[in-house]
Regions:
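A short glycine-rich, aromatic-capped structural motif
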Residues: 1-14, 18-38, 87, 144, ...
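Intrinsically disordered, low-complexity segments enriched in polar/charged small residues
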Residues: 9, 164-167, 198
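Functional-site microenvironments in short loops/helix caps that host divalent-cation chemistry
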Residues: 27-179, 183, 188
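Short, structured beta-strand segments at or near domain termini in extracellular proteins/domains
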Residues: 188-198
Length: 198
């Protein structure tokens, strides 16, 4: 949340905390953030996305926009689904070493339905990032905590997300599990991770 707040000046989360993952963002909010982060760190000329015809809800969340990706740009962007899976596997192409990102034991690497409760009387909530073991590439929370939007479309209106969330069953936190929803949807268990082409 800390970086999201610094770049956009807003925080879409209900439960606030600098080290919590940003969530409750639409796919459109995520690509917009990527451009804003690029402008701040690299300049507008390196923005990967052209975003036009933006529509927002009463809270300022983007609910629709026309988005195209210039793959020659080096700015921040959402990973493709293939890039996301390679990162979740620790950067090992074709490596099927672990069921989850960094381990076969989900409790070592992920916050999910089975361990995210503070106690059985409270509801699940996202946890601070980096509290579980990293994978081989040094990446945290690629299984569990919050799902992550990817660039890829499932159909005209829907986008893929990966990784599982704190409210997910263990089967949804594997490196191969994939889901999708309308790009305008936002949930407590859905966030994103940025990447760059080098």
């Amino acid at each position: 949340q800390e970086l999201y707040m610094a770049v956009t000046g807003t925080n879409p989360r209900i439960d606030k905390g600098e080290k919590l993952p940003v969530n409750r963002v639409t796919w459109y909010d995520a690509v917009y953030f990527c451009n804003e982060l690029t402008k701040v760190t690299m300049g507008e000329d390196e923005c990967c996305y052209s975003i036009s015809y933006i529509e927002k809800d009463e809270d300022g969340n983007i609910t629709w926009a026309k988005v195209s990706w210039d793959q020659n740009k080096k700015g921040y962007r959402l990973p493709t689904e293939a890039e996301w899976e390679m990162a979740a596997r620790g950067g090992v192409q074709g490596g099927w070493d672990y069921k989850y990102s960094g381990s076969d034991d989900i409790n070592v690497v992920a916050w999910y339905d089975g361990n995210a409760y503070e106690n059985k009387c409270e509801s699940n909530v996202a946890k601070n990032v980096g509290l579980k073991k990293a994978n081989k590439a040094g990446l945290y929370d690629m299984s569990g905590n919050v799902y992550e939007w990817c660039w890829d479309a499932m159909n005209e209106w829907s986008r893929i997300y990966r990784g599982g969330g704190y409210y997910s069953y263990s089967s949804e936190c594997t490196v191969i599990y994939r889901a999708y929803d309308d790009a305008y949807e936002r949930y407590n268990t859905l966030g994103f991770r940025v990447c760059r082409s080098l």
